[in-house]
Structures are given as C-alpha cells and as structure tokens.
C-alpha cells in the first residue's frame, strides 16, 4: 500500500494503467479494495507528512516500544499491580541510594588522587625550579636526593626521640632506686636512734653526769699539761695512762677561777720526771723550757702586736670613768699576785 502511494506521489498523482492493473490483480484476502477511498486522501497524507513529521516519528517510536514490550516478557515478571509497583519503586530508591553512595565514594577517591597528583606536580615544579637555579650556580639537585635528605632527617628525629625516651625511662629507674635507698637509709637511721636511746636510757642520770665531767676534766688537764690544743682522740689514752698518778678533778662547788688555777700544772712539777706515756714525743723537754729563744733575724709585722715581758708584771692604770665592763676586768693587784711561769713567758714571746 505504501509502495503504491509512494509510486503515485512520485508520479505526480497520475495513475497509470500499470498501477491500476497491479492493484486490481491482487487477491481479495490480500487487498480488500481501496484503503483511502480516492485521491483526496493522498493530499491529506502529503500535508500531514510535511507538517507533522516530528510528531509522527514520536508516535512511531512509542508504538514500536509498546510493541516490543508486548512481544518480550518483562524482567520483573509483574502484572502492573499497585503492590508490585510500590516494591519496584522502593527497590529503585534503594538502588538510587546505593548509586549515590558509590558516586560519593568515587568523588572522594577522585579528590584524594587529585590532591596527591597536585602535590606531586608542585614538587616537580619546585624541583625543576631548584634544579634550574642550581644549574645556573653550578649545582644539581634531584627529587630523589631531596627525598633521601628528608628521610634522613626523619630518621634522625626519630632516633633523637627514642634516645630522649630511653633517657627518661633510665632517669625514672634511677630515681626509683635512689628513693628505695633513701627509704632503707632512713629505716637504718631510725634503728640507730632507737638503739642509742635504749643504751642511753640504761645509764642512770646520777651516774651519767659525773662520768662526763671526769672525762672533760681529764681532757682539760691533758691540754694544760702538754701545751697542745684539745684533741678528743687523745683523751681516752691520756685518761688511761695518767689516771693513777693525777689528782682527782675538783668538785663543782669551787669557782671557775679556782678550777682553772688548780688544773694548771705548777712550774716546779715540770722538773720531775713523769712516768712514760703515749704522748711523750709530743711534749716539750724540761731543759728546753728554761732556755731563752734566740732573737728573730728580721723584724716582722707582728712585733707591734706582741706584749713585752716587762709589761706583763706592770699593773694597768685604772680607767677614768667607771663603766659596765669594770666587773669583767681583772684588778691590778690580782695581776701582780699571780705566780711566775716561765712557760707562759715563752709562749707570750712567741
């Protein structure tokens, strides 16, 4: 039919005897008479095709799609009911959400890759610029060398951090050990104090003070008799060697002046030989005590500070106005009444 129409349209709307003969010779079951009923339909179709070509193409595509849907069965296998459509809509929503999540992941990955690529491009640009500058100045620097230096710096930094952490751990262990030793020392000190308190409490107060006074007096007597300063480690030996032939120390009822005078050894007692003792080598021989010392070769700066021998026996003039220190000074008559000791004269000259 369309072939005939096209042929008639190409022939300018004029029928030929050949076309009429072809149409009339067709069988009735294949061609049931004229479809369009005459020539006016040809003009209508021609105008329609010229003006509504796009609409016809759309209708044709829609018909083709519907025809294909009727021929091929649907993949979902539903009959178009409301429940099936709702399930399909929900599945489509889930699928769209999954697609959206996948797209977001893809975009995130793309941004990360883009950032890395931009960093590499920037590093390459910097390296190129540095290489160009170093090439002008006679140097050369590559990206591998720069990365190697960066890795070396990172390793050095990590090594320093490791050393600092080890030093901190060692310091903590040392402080813990010192704290342990301090606790042990404090416990030992506490035990020592308890032992001292225990043995000190075993001596009664009535027996404790005379013993201390006896040792102290022996030490003072040793100092005055030997002319040496007081050394505590000589006190026990002197007390042991000289306890038999020395008089007992004075009682506490005497005054301080009487005690000091009684403890001093008289000059005539130095002439008699004493029993041998441990400190004989430290004492001055008796013949050396009476021998005058030779005069000094050169005058020294301390000559003005020494007291002459004749001034020792001269009474001091009384002070003009009485003061608060008069009671502390020695009266002139007491100075003259003191016995003469050649040993004191030798010491004063020295």
Swiss-Prot record:
Q: Cite the InterPro entries for this sequence.
A: NPIP, NPIP_N
User: Where is the segment annotated Disordered?
Assistant: 151-170
Name the source's superkingdom: Eukaryota
Q: Which PANTHER family match?
A: NUCLEAR PORE COMPLEX INTERACTING PROTEIN, NUCLEAR PORE COMPLEX-INTERACTING PROTEIN FAMILY MEMBER A1-RELATED
Q: Which family does the record claim for this protein? A: Belongs to the NPIP family.
Put simply, this protein is called: Nuclear pore complex-interacting protein family member A5
Its lineage opens with: Eukaryota, Metazoa, Chordata, Craniata, Vertebrata
């Amino acid at each position: 039919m369309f072939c005939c129409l096209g042929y008639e349209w190409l022939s300018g709307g004029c029928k030929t005897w050949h076309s009429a003969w072809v149409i009339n010779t067709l069988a009735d079951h294949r061609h049931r008479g004229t479809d369009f009923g005459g020539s006016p339909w040809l003009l209508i179709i021609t105008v329609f095709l010229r003006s509504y070509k796009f609409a016809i193409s759309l209708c044709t595509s829609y018909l083709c799609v519907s025809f294909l849907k009727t021929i091929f069965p649907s993949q979902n296998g539903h009959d178009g009911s409301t429940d099936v459509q709702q399930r399909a809509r929900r599945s489509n929503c889930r699928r769209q959400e999954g697609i959206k999540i996948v797209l977001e992941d893809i975009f995130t990955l793309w941004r990360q890759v883009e950032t890395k690529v931009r960093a590499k491009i920037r590093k390459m640009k910097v390296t190129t610029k540095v290489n160009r500058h170093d090439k002008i100045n006679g140097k050369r620097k590559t990206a591998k060398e720069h990365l190697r230096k960066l890795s070396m710096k990172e390793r050095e930094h990590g090594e320093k951090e490791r050393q600092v952490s080890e030093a901190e751990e060692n310091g903590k262990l040392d402080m813990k050990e010192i704290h342990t030793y301090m606790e042990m020392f404090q416990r030992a000190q506490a035990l020592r104090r308890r032992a001292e308190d225990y043995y000190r409490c075993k001596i009664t107060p009535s027996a404790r003070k005379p013993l201390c006074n006896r040792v102290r007096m022996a030490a003072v007597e040793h100092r005055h008799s030997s002319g040496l300063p007081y050394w505590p480690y000589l006190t026990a030996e002197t007390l042991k060697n000289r306890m038999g032939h020395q008089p007992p120390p004075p009682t506490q009822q005497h005054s301080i002046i009487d005690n000091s005078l009684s403890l001093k050894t008289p000059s005539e007692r130095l002439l008699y030989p004493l029993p041998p003792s441990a400190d004989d080598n430290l004492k001055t021989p008796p013949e050396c005590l009476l021998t005058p010392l030779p005069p000094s070769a050169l005058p020294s700066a301390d000559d003005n500070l020494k007291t002459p021998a004749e001034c020792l026996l001269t009474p001091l003039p009384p002070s003009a106005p009485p003061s608060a220190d008069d009671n502390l000074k020695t009266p002139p008559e007491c100075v003259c009444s003191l016995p003469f000791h050649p040993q004191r004269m030798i010491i004063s000259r020295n």
